[in-house]
Amino acid sequence: MFRVITCNTNGIRAAERKGFFRWLAKQRADVVCIQEIKAKEVQLTDQAFYPKGYHCFYNESDRPGYAGTAVFAKHKPQRVITRLDWDIVDSEGRYLQVDFPGLSVVSLYVPSG
């Protein structure tokens, strides 16, 4: 069975401080989709943000501390898509797709309202 988990972290650095990655290590997920990372990848230097055994992909917002998505995948995807040619979605890092043979998984952050 293929196990996918999705989670809105409301800030991946704050989630890390609250034990998110310790929790994640127990979940045995094949793919983890994360929304609202609220960080630039250059800020994610600690190894905690790149869990062992996962290929990690981040799609950050142009605006610091806002929106953004990520995907952690046990198997290396054939393709990673971060752009839809839709300015508001692309500039805020709201879409991240990973493609595997016969399956695509999308981490999508859509605001309420």
Roles of regions detected by a PLM:
Residues 37-38, 45-113:
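Structured beta-strand-rich core segments of catalytic domains in phosphoester-bond hydrolases
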